Amino acid sequence: MSNVDINHARALVYQLLSSLFAREVNAQRLQELTSDAAQQFWTQLGHEPEFSAPVATMQKVLNDLQRNDALLELAADYCGLFLVGTRHSASPYASLYLNSEDEPLLFGQQHQQMSEFLHQSKLQVQSHFPEPADHLAVMLAYMGHLACHSEDAAQLNFLDACIDSWLAKFVVKVVECDSKHRNGFYSALASLTLAWVKQDKQLLEQTINSSVEQTLS
């Protein structure tokens, strides 16, 4: 597989993770996520030992969501976890995990920083997604963009400074708040995202180090 193909595959994973944090799963999205092509994708992703458990959980939940009431229940889980700003929710904004203030403000430093990244890449948050730019879905989507349009060093810098710096804290909060829900879909999604980011970061580090060694040899 060429570097272009690898980066395209990486971008697809980032876009998938982004989409699942961006909005609840509706009937149309469910059909896409359970199609034959999607099942092959999930199976391939689940072959990696670090991803197998969360992928299996997510596949099972998605395949069981054939009842309308089950789909509504998952949508309610999404709302309760990510849209309701209480101690029992897991707000997906970097500023809430990176700032030391007792009550960090949305649209603060991390939002401004992310907005500048988007501006430099001639991108912007779409109007139908009225969220601060430091929302995890925006950052994952941007990382997917970088995977196909930026050098490895730039990708690693963004991944390390803007996502990996707070993702583990967010995942702990998701798992804690999602524990009362039986299917555990969003706990699995959060765990998969963290595992993916860790592995991708390692891949980028290895690629950069290999390039340096080739240059010096």
Swiss-Prot record:
PANTHER family found in the cross-reference section: CHAPERONE PROTEIN TORD, CHAPERONE PROTEIN YCDY
Family: Belongs to the TorD/DmsD family. TorD subfamily.
Keyword Chaperone on entry: yes
Organism: Shewanella oneidensis (strain ATCC 700550 / JCM 31522 / CIP 106686 / LMG 19005 / NCIMB 14063 / MR-1)
Protein location: Cytoplasm
Designated name of the protein: Chaperone protein TorD
InterPro entries cross-referenced by the UniProt entry: Chaperone_TorD (IPR023069), DMSO/NO3_reduct_chaperone (IPR020945), HscB_C_sf (IPR036386), TorD-like_sf (IPR036411), TorD/DmsD_chaperones (IPR050289)
SUPFAM superfamilies, per database record: TorD-like
Recorded superkingdom: Bacteria
Chain's role: Involved in the biogenesis of TorA. Acts on TorA before the insertion of the molybdenum cofactor and, as a result, probably favors a conformation of the apoenzyme that is competent for acquiring the cofactor.
UniProt GO cellular component terms: cytoplasm
Signal sequence extent: none
One example of a Gene Ontology biological process annotation: protein folding
Transit peptide as UniProt keyword: no
Keywords noted in UniProt: Chaperone, Cytoplasm
